[in-house]
Amino acid sequence: MANSRTVLILCGDYMEDYEVMVPFQALQAFGITVHTVCPGKKAGDSCPTAVHDFCGHQTYFESRGHNFTLNATFDEVDLSKYDGLVIPGGRAPEYLALTASVVELVKEFSRSGKPIASICHGQLILAAADTVNGRKCTAYATVGPSLVAAGAKWVEPITPDVCVVDGSLITAATYEGHPEFIQLFVKALGGKITGANKRILFLCGDYMEDYEVKVPFQSLQALGCQVDAVCPEKKAGDRCPTAIHDFEGDQTYSEKPGHTFALTTNFDDLVSSSYDALVIPGGRAPEYLALNEHVLNIVKEFMNSEKPVASICHGQQILAAAGVLKGRKCTAYPAVKLNVVLGGGTWLEPDPIDRCFTDGNLVTGAAWPGHPEFVSQLMALLGIQVSF
């Protein structure tokens, strides 16, 4: 994309899983080049992430998230080549705020006046770099006293999706604020979003893959789309548990518990014809959703009306069960090849695993590493553009 942008994400061990991956993949989907670095690590190394979620206790709980692979080397970073900086939250900022090279990097970005977007506990690094003195900012509530001590004009996060802008500084309280957080960052980079007045429906289920619902969901929200999520036998406000599927050297993916995902609409009240596109996440949910006639009828309705349908990983099990793959070119997670072939689809090998394909109104992807292309191809079908 002509005149696009390049941004840097400052990573660390046990940064929050969503707070690194959602901006990382959303920004790439919008045509922005994104580099990720961690002090003491090189391109190809990985950082373990943390899942932070709420289950009724007085504070969040933590469990292991995905392994996040870095694509650049910290010691080789030339800050003059970057147009903006993103700082995820989680536990990583606690120790990164004590790392001199990290603090100096943030100071240099601040002096340049380039946009800095920091979320949740990431603002601890901003405080250590003396970049919040006299500036309005928010953060996860427990970070407030540190920011006040650093001279910030503290904005209380009344809701978890609060975002605050002060000049080139964008801050947010938690990953629930990602849609506005990312949209504000794109705007600060000089981006313009057009064609996003669309309504998108997500077909969800228990133990869908964590990234495969949250990344496209919040990416589309960040563009300005109205995005709804439904699940059979559940209502608005109910939650679906998710599964973290990762590649850790075994013969197949591993599974760990992920975040819980909040639904926005009652399944039984759904008027599917009011939506412009359908998204089907992968994970284990499609195995049982493919047995639900109401779900299959929704898929048939979208395909028969030639509205965009985007399905990833194991989501194509639902497409096969709905009988909509006959004569269509399609990829999926490799283990789903049998479903695709038996369903009459023409199998497209996902090599590499982040390959995505568009055949008419159908976008298919193999796994969550392909989200940037997956979301980008859906944007193309919907006529949504991000320009700089």
Curated annotation (Swiss-Prot):
Post-translational modification: Cys-120 and Cys-313 are oxidized to sulfinic acid.
Residues with the Cysteine sulfinic acid (-SO2H) modification: 313
GO cellular component: cytosol
In-chain residues carrying the UniProt-annotated modification Cysteine sulfenic acid (-SOH): 120
Annotated consequence of substituting residue 287 to A: Reduces catalytic activity 6-fold. Almost abolishes catalytic activity
Purpose: Possesses glyoxalase I activity. Catalyzes the conversion of hemimercaptal, formed from methylglyoxal and glutathione, to S-lactoylglutathione. May be involved in oxidative stress response.
pH dependence: Optimum pH is 6.8.
MF annotations from Gene Ontology: glyoxalase III activity; lactoylglutathione lyase activity
Catalytic activity: (R)-S-lactoylglutathione = methylglyoxal + glutathione
Temperature dependence: Optimum temperature is 45 degrees Celsius.
Protein's UniProt name: Protein DJ-1 homolog D
UniProt xrefs under InterPro entries: C56_PfpI-like, Class_I_gatase-like, DJ-1/PfpI
UniProt entry keywords in alphabetical sequence: Lyase, Oxidation, Repeat, Stress response
UniProt family annotation: Belongs to the peptidase C56 family.
Annotated ranges, domain PfpI endopeptidase: 5-190, 198-383
Record-annotated active site: 120-121, 313-314
Subunit structure as annotated in this protein's UniProt entry: Homotrimer.
Enzyme class: lyase
EC number, UniProt record: 4.4.1.5
UniProt cross-references to PANTHER family, sorted A to Z: DJ-1 PROTEIN, DJ-1_THIJ_PFPI FAMILY PROTEIN
